[in-house]
Amino acid sequence: MAEKEVKLMKGNEVIAHAAIRYGCDGYFGYPITPQSEVMETLMELKPWETTGMVVLQAESEISSINMVYGGASTGKRVMTSSSSPGISLMSEGLSYLAGAELPCLVINCQRGGPGLGTIQPSQGDYFQACKGGGHGDFHMIVLAPNSVQEMHDHVAEAFDLAFKYRNPAMILADGAIGQMMEKVVLAPQRPRKTDEEIAAECRSWATYGKPADRKRNIVTSLELQSEKMEIINKRLQEKYKALEENEVRYEEIGCDDADYVIVAFGSSARICSATVEMARAEGLKVGLLRPITLYPFPKKPLAELAARGVKGFLSAELNAGQMVEDVRLAVNGAAPVEHYGRQGGMLFAPDEVLVALKEKLINKK
Protein backbone atom coordinates (compact mmCIF):
# COMPACT_ATOMS: atom_id res chain seq x y z
CA MET A 1 0.00 0.00 0.00
CA ALA A 2 1.39 3.44 -0.96
CA GLU A 3 2.80 5.64 1.79
CA LYS A 4 0.66 8.57 0.64
CA GLU A 5 -2.21 8.63 -1.82
CA VAL A 6 -4.48 11.38 -3.11
CA LYS A 7 -7.85 10.16 -4.32
CA LEU A 8 -11.30 11.40 -5.24
CA MET A 9 -13.90 9.60 -3.16
CA LYS A 10 -17.07 9.87 -1.11
CA GLY A 11 -17.07 10.71 2.57
CA ASN A 12 -18.48 7.29 3.42
CA GLU A 13 -15.85 5.55 1.31
CA VAL A 14 -13.01 7.43 2.96
CA ILE A 15 -14.19 6.28 6.41
CA ALA A 16 -13.48 2.71 5.31
CA HIS A 17 -10.03 3.59 3.93
CA ALA A 18 -9.16 5.56 7.07
CA ALA A 19 -10.28 2.74 9.36
CA ILE A 20 -7.88 0.33 7.65
CA ARG A 21 -5.00 2.80 7.46
CA TYR A 22 -5.32 3.84 11.10
CA GLY A 23 -5.06 0.26 12.36
CA CYS A 24 -8.67 -0.57 13.14
CA ASP A 25 -9.08 -4.16 14.35
CA GLY A 26 -12.75 -4.71 13.61
CA TYR A 27 -15.87 -3.26 12.03
CA PHE A 28 -19.34 -4.56 12.88
CA GLY A 29 -22.27 -2.95 11.11
CA TYR A 30 -25.59 -3.17 9.37
CA PRO A 31 -26.57 -1.38 6.13
CA ILE A 32 -28.76 1.72 6.14
CA THR A 33 -28.89 4.66 3.74
CA PRO A 34 -27.10 7.11 3.52
CA GLN A 35 -24.04 5.39 5.05
CA SER A 36 -24.07 1.92 3.50
CA GLU A 37 -20.93 2.64 1.46
CA VAL A 38 -18.83 2.39 4.63
CA MET A 39 -19.36 -1.36 4.94
CA GLU A 40 -19.59 -1.88 1.17
CA THR A 41 -16.16 -0.30 0.71
CA LEU A 42 -14.67 -2.37 3.52
CA MET A 43 -16.01 -5.53 1.90
CA GLU A 44 -14.48 -4.49 -1.43
CA LEU A 45 -11.10 -3.69 0.14
CA LYS A 46 -10.95 -7.04 2.02
CA PRO A 47 -8.67 -5.81 4.83
CA TRP A 48 -8.75 -9.24 6.48
CA GLU A 49 -6.36 -10.32 3.71
CA THR A 50 -3.89 -7.46 4.31
CA THR A 51 -4.03 -6.13 7.87
CA GLY A 52 -6.12 -8.84 9.51
CA MET A 53 -8.99 -6.43 10.25
CA VAL A 54 -12.32 -8.18 10.85
CA VAL A 55 -15.32 -6.90 8.86
CA LEU A 56 -18.69 -8.41 9.69
CA GLN A 57 -22.28 -7.59 8.76
CA ALA A 58 -24.39 -8.27 11.83
CA GLU A 59 -28.06 -9.24 11.73
CA SER A 60 -29.11 -5.88 13.19
CA GLU A 61 -27.84 -2.62 14.63
CA ILE A 62 -28.43 -4.01 18.11
CA SER A 63 -26.18 -6.97 17.39
CA SER A 64 -23.49 -4.80 15.83
CA ILE A 65 -23.15 -2.47 18.82
CA ASN A 66 -22.94 -5.44 21.17
CA MET A 67 -20.22 -6.96 18.99
CA VAL A 68 -18.42 -3.63 19.35
CA TYR A 69 -18.81 -3.97 23.13
CA GLY A 70 -17.19 -7.40 23.02
CA GLY A 71 -14.31 -6.30 20.83
CA ALA A 72 -13.70 -3.13 22.85
CA SER A 73 -13.55 -5.19 26.04
CA THR A 74 -10.38 -6.84 24.76
CA GLY A 75 -8.62 -3.53 24.07
CA LYS A 76 -9.06 -3.74 20.30
CA ARG A 77 -9.81 -0.72 18.09
CA VAL A 78 -13.34 -1.47 16.93
CA MET A 79 -16.06 0.55 15.26
CA THR A 80 -19.51 0.60 13.72
CA SER A 81 -21.48 2.95 11.50
CA SER A 82 -25.15 3.68 10.94
CA SER A 83 -27.64 6.45 10.31
CA SER A 84 -30.16 8.11 12.61
CA PRO A 85 -32.77 5.36 13.30
CA GLY A 86 -30.01 2.78 13.42
CA ILE A 87 -28.17 4.80 16.06
CA SER A 88 -31.39 4.87 18.10
CA LEU A 89 -31.34 1.07 18.11
CA MET A 90 -27.75 1.19 19.35
CA SER A 91 -28.48 3.57 22.22
CA GLU A 92 -28.63 0.91 24.95
CA GLY A 93 -25.29 -0.50 23.83
CA LEU A 94 -23.75 2.97 23.73
CA SER A 95 -24.80 3.53 27.33
CA TYR A 96 -23.32 0.17 28.32
CA LEU A 97 -20.06 1.05 26.56
CA ALA A 98 -19.86 4.39 28.37
CA GLY A 99 -20.77 2.79 31.70
CA ALA A 100 -18.08 0.15 31.29
CA GLU A 101 -15.62 2.83 30.09
CA LEU A 102 -14.88 1.12 26.80
CA PRO A 103 -13.31 2.99 23.86
CA CYS A 104 -14.87 2.60 20.42
CA LEU A 105 -15.80 4.60 17.32
CA VAL A 106 -19.34 5.12 16.04
CA ILE A 107 -20.17 6.87 12.76
CA ASN A 108 -23.58 8.53 12.42
CA CYS A 109 -24.30 9.74 8.89
CA GLN A 110 -27.50 11.59 9.78
CA ARG A 111 -30.71 11.51 7.77
CA GLY A 112 -33.94 13.45 8.16
CA GLY A 113 -36.42 12.36 10.82
CA PRO A 114 -38.09 11.67 13.14
CA GLY A 115 -39.05 8.06 12.51
CA LEU A 116 -37.89 6.56 9.23
CA GLY A 117 -38.03 10.07 7.81
CA THR A 118 -36.00 10.59 4.64
CA ILE A 119 -32.59 9.55 3.37
CA GLN A 120 -31.62 13.19 2.76
CA PRO A 121 -29.13 15.02 5.05
CA SER A 122 -30.11 16.41 8.44
CA GLN A 123 -28.57 17.54 11.72
CA GLY A 124 -31.51 16.45 13.82
CA ASP A 125 -29.46 14.04 15.95
CA TYR A 126 -27.49 16.73 17.80
CA PHE A 127 -29.41 16.22 21.05
CA GLN A 128 -29.06 12.45 20.79
CA ALA A 129 -25.31 12.59 20.18
CA CYS A 130 -24.33 15.41 22.53
CA LYS A 131 -26.67 14.90 25.45
CA GLY A 132 -25.75 11.28 26.01
CA GLY A 133 -26.89 8.91 23.29
CA GLY A 134 -28.73 6.59 25.65
CA HIS A 135 -29.95 6.28 29.23
CA GLY A 136 -27.99 7.51 32.22
CA ASP A 137 -25.58 10.36 32.94
CA PHE A 138 -22.95 9.94 30.24
CA HIS A 139 -21.40 11.68 27.26
CA MET A 140 -19.84 10.50 24.04
CA ILE A 141 -16.96 12.39 22.48
CA VAL A 142 -18.51 13.93 19.35
CA LEU A 143 -16.59 15.21 16.31
CA ALA A 144 -18.35 16.98 13.43
CA PRO A 145 -16.53 16.91 10.05
CA ASN A 146 -17.29 19.48 7.35
CA SER A 147 -15.34 17.84 4.52
CA VAL A 148 -14.34 14.47 3.15
CA GLN A 149 -10.78 15.13 4.36
CA GLU A 150 -12.06 15.69 7.89
CA MET A 151 -14.11 12.48 7.68
CA HIS A 152 -10.77 10.75 7.09
CA ASP A 153 -8.79 12.66 9.70
CA HIS A 154 -11.43 12.37 12.43
CA VAL A 155 -11.20 8.57 12.36
CA ALA A 156 -7.70 8.73 13.82
CA GLU A 157 -8.54 11.55 16.21
CA ALA A 158 -11.71 9.86 17.43
CA PHE A 159 -9.92 6.58 18.12
CA ASP A 160 -7.09 8.37 19.92
CA LEU A 161 -9.50 10.35 22.11
CA ALA A 162 -11.62 7.26 22.78
CA PHE A 163 -8.61 5.37 24.11
CA LYS A 164 -7.16 8.37 25.96
CA TYR A 165 -10.40 8.79 27.92
CA ARG A 166 -11.75 5.21 27.70
CA ASN A 167 -15.01 6.47 26.23
CA PRO A 168 -17.11 5.96 23.10
CA ALA A 169 -16.44 8.53 20.38
CA MET A 170 -18.81 9.48 17.57
CA ILE A 171 -18.22 11.12 14.22
CA LEU A 172 -21.48 13.01 13.63
CA ALA A 173 -21.68 13.52 9.87
CA ASP A 174 -24.71 13.79 7.60
CA GLY A 175 -25.88 12.54 4.24
CA ALA A 176 -24.34 15.50 2.42
CA ILE A 177 -20.82 14.91 3.76
CA GLY A 178 -21.20 11.14 3.44
CA GLN A 179 -22.25 11.23 -0.20
CA MET A 180 -20.21 14.15 -1.56
CA MET A 181 -17.00 13.43 -3.47
CA GLU A 182 -13.83 15.42 -2.83
CA LYS A 183 -10.09 15.08 -3.10
CA VAL A 184 -8.64 13.48 0.00
CA VAL A 185 -5.09 12.75 1.13
CA LEU A 186 -5.01 9.23 2.56
CA ALA A 187 -2.73 8.60 5.52
CA PRO A 188 0.16 6.14 5.43
CA GLN A 189 -0.70 2.67 6.70
CA ARG A 190 -0.37 2.26 10.46
CA PRO A 191 0.18 -1.28 11.73
CA ARG A 192 -2.51 -2.70 13.98
CA LYS A 193 -1.55 -2.93 17.64
CA THR A 194 0.03 -6.25 18.54
CA ASP A 195 -1.35 -8.35 21.38
CA GLU A 196 1.73 -7.40 23.39
CA GLU A 197 1.14 -3.68 22.81
CA ILE A 198 -2.52 -4.02 23.78
CA ALA A 199 -1.54 -5.90 26.93
CA ALA A 200 0.90 -3.14 27.87
CA GLU A 201 -1.42 -0.21 27.10
CA CYS A 202 -4.72 -1.66 28.36
CA ARG A 203 -3.40 -3.81 31.20
CA SER A 204 -5.55 -2.19 33.89
CA TRP A 205 -8.92 -2.89 32.28
CA ALA A 206 -8.95 -5.01 29.09
CA THR A 207 -9.84 -8.71 29.05
CA TYR A 208 -7.04 -9.83 26.75
CA GLY A 209 -6.14 -12.88 28.86
CA LYS A 210 -5.09 -12.93 32.50
CA PRO A 211 -1.36 -13.12 33.20
CA ALA A 212 -0.23 -14.52 36.52
CA ASP A 213 0.91 -11.17 37.92
CA ARG A 214 -2.42 -9.29 38.00
CA LYS A 215 -6.00 -9.70 39.16
CA ARG A 216 -8.79 -10.46 36.73
CA ASN A 217 -10.17 -7.55 34.74
CA ILE A 218 -13.96 -7.54 34.81
CA VAL A 219 -15.80 -5.43 32.24
CA THR A 220 -19.21 -4.34 33.47
CA SER A 221 -21.43 -1.32 34.00
CA LEU A 222 -23.39 -3.03 36.78
CA GLU A 223 -23.16 -1.90 40.41
CA LEU A 224 -26.06 -2.75 42.72
CA GLN A 225 -24.85 -0.72 45.70
CA SER A 226 -26.09 2.86 45.31
CA GLU A 227 -23.18 4.37 47.22
CA LYS A 228 -20.65 2.73 44.90
CA MET A 229 -22.70 3.61 41.82
CA GLU A 230 -22.63 7.26 42.83
CA ILE A 231 -18.84 7.11 43.18
CA ILE A 232 -18.59 5.61 39.68
CA ASN A 233 -20.84 8.32 38.26
CA LYS A 234 -18.81 11.05 39.92
CA ARG A 235 -15.64 9.59 38.43
CA LEU A 236 -17.26 9.63 34.99
CA GLN A 237 -18.22 13.27 35.47
CA GLU A 238 -14.62 14.12 36.34
CA LYS A 239 -13.58 12.52 33.06
CA TYR A 240 -16.09 14.64 31.15
CA LYS A 241 -14.80 17.70 32.97
CA ALA A 242 -11.27 16.86 31.78
CA LEU A 243 -12.59 16.52 28.24
CA GLU A 244 -14.20 19.96 28.46
CA GLU A 245 -10.99 21.50 29.78
CA ASN A 246 -8.55 19.89 27.36
CA GLU A 247 -10.17 18.66 24.15
CA VAL A 248 -12.32 21.47 22.71
CA ARG A 249 -11.75 21.99 18.99
CA TYR A 250 -13.24 24.75 16.86
CA GLU A 251 -12.53 27.01 13.89
CA GLU A 252 -13.09 30.76 13.62
CA ILE A 253 -13.52 32.59 10.31
CA GLY A 254 -13.61 36.38 10.37
CA CYS A 255 -14.43 36.59 14.07
CA ASP A 256 -11.66 39.03 15.05
CA ASP A 257 -13.69 42.13 14.16
CA ALA A 258 -17.15 40.57 13.79
CA ASP A 259 -20.25 42.38 14.99
CA TYR A 260 -22.33 39.26 14.36
CA VAL A 261 -21.27 35.62 14.48
CA ILE A 262 -22.87 32.61 12.81
CA VAL A 263 -22.42 29.33 14.67
CA ALA A 264 -22.67 26.23 12.47
CA PHE A 265 -21.19 22.74 12.23
CA GLY A 266 -20.70 20.10 9.56
CA SER A 267 -22.18 20.74 6.12
CA SER A 268 -24.03 23.79 7.49
CA ALA A 269 -20.71 25.43 8.29
CA ARG A 270 -19.54 25.01 4.70
CA ILE A 271 -22.65 26.80 3.50
CA CYS A 272 -22.30 29.52 6.13
CA SER A 273 -18.68 30.25 5.18
CA ALA A 274 -20.10 31.51 1.88
CA THR A 275 -22.64 33.56 3.86
CA VAL A 276 -19.75 35.28 5.65
CA GLU A 277 -18.15 36.16 2.31
CA MET A 278 -21.45 37.58 1.01
CA ALA A 279 -21.95 39.62 4.17
CA ARG A 280 -18.41 41.00 4.08
CA ALA A 281 -18.92 42.00 0.44
CA GLU A 282 -21.86 44.11 1.62
CA GLY A 283 -19.75 45.74 4.33
CA LEU A 284 -21.27 43.71 7.16
CA LYS A 285 -18.83 42.47 9.80
CA VAL A 286 -19.95 38.86 10.10
CA GLY A 287 -17.89 35.90 11.32
CA LEU A 288 -18.32 32.16 11.65
CA LEU A 289 -17.52 29.93 14.60
CA ARG A 290 -17.50 26.26 13.64
CA PRO A 291 -17.52 23.74 16.50
CA ILE A 292 -15.40 20.76 15.50
CA THR A 293 -16.05 19.00 18.78
CA LEU A 294 -19.76 19.14 19.53
CA TYR A 295 -18.97 17.46 22.81
CA PRO A 296 -17.02 18.97 24.40
CA PHE A 297 -18.72 22.11 23.09
CA PRO A 298 -16.71 25.36 22.61
CA LYS A 299 -18.45 27.28 25.39
CA LYS A 300 -15.47 29.44 26.34
CA PRO A 301 -14.74 30.83 22.83
CA LEU A 302 -18.39 31.81 22.44
CA ALA A 303 -18.43 33.45 25.87
CA GLU A 304 -15.27 35.37 24.99
CA LEU A 305 -16.77 36.63 21.73
CA ALA A 306 -19.86 37.79 23.61
CA ALA A 307 -17.75 39.50 26.26
CA ARG A 308 -15.74 41.24 23.54
CA GLY A 309 -18.89 42.91 22.26
CA VAL A 310 -20.39 40.73 19.52
CA LYS A 311 -23.92 42.08 19.01
CA GLY A 312 -25.64 38.81 18.19
CA PHE A 313 -25.25 35.13 17.31
CA LEU A 314 -27.15 33.07 14.73
CA SER A 315 -27.12 29.30 15.16
CA ALA A 316 -27.60 27.86 11.67
CA GLU A 317 -28.58 24.19 11.75
CA LEU A 318 -30.39 21.60 9.65
CA ASN A 319 -32.95 21.04 12.39
CA ALA A 320 -35.62 22.85 14.38
CA GLY A 321 -33.13 24.30 16.87
CA GLN A 322 -30.86 22.10 18.96
CA MET A 323 -27.30 23.43 19.12
CA VAL A 324 -28.81 26.88 19.65
CA GLU A 325 -29.55 25.86 23.25
CA ASP A 326 -25.84 25.31 23.91
CA VAL A 327 -24.98 28.59 22.20
CA ARG A 328 -27.43 30.41 24.48
CA LEU A 329 -25.96 28.75 27.56
CA ALA A 330 -22.44 29.76 26.49
CA VAL A 331 -23.38 33.36 25.69
CA ASN A 332 -25.34 33.52 28.96
CA GLY A 333 -27.47 36.52 28.06
CA ALA A 334 -24.59 38.76 27.00
CA ALA A 335 -26.00 39.05 23.46
CA PRO A 336 -29.08 37.91 21.53
CA VAL A 337 -28.95 34.35 20.15
CA GLU A 338 -31.29 33.29 17.33
CA HIS A 339 -31.78 30.13 15.29
CA TYR A 340 -32.25 29.55 11.58
CA GLY A 341 -32.75 26.09 10.14
CA ARG A 342 -34.23 23.83 7.50
CA GLN A 343 -35.66 20.39 8.24
CA GLY A 344 -36.69 17.13 6.65
CA GLY A 345 -33.59 16.78 4.48
CA MET A 346 -33.68 20.32 3.06
CA LEU A 347 -30.46 22.35 2.88
CA PHE A 348 -30.34 26.13 3.20
CA ALA A 349 -28.46 28.36 0.75
CA PRO A 350 -25.88 30.99 1.79
CA ASP A 351 -28.19 33.86 0.84
CA GLU A 352 -31.02 32.38 2.93
CA VAL A 353 -28.81 32.45 6.00
CA LEU A 354 -27.81 36.06 5.29
CA VAL A 355 -31.46 37.08 4.97
CA ALA A 356 -32.21 35.34 8.28
CA LEU A 357 -29.25 37.06 9.94
CA LYS A 358 -30.50 40.46 8.81
CA GLU A 359 -34.12 39.82 9.79
CA LYS A 360 -33.43 38.22 13.16
CA LEU A 361 -30.47 40.30 14.34
CA ILE A 362 -28.94 43.04 12.18
CA ASN A 363 -32.14 44.87 11.19
CA LYS A 364 -34.24 43.85 14.17
CA LYS A 365 -35.72 46.81 16.00
Describe the predicted segments one by one.
Residues 317-365:
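Peripheral docking tails and interdomain loops at the edges
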Residues 140-197, 352-365:
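Structural signature of the thiamine diphosphate
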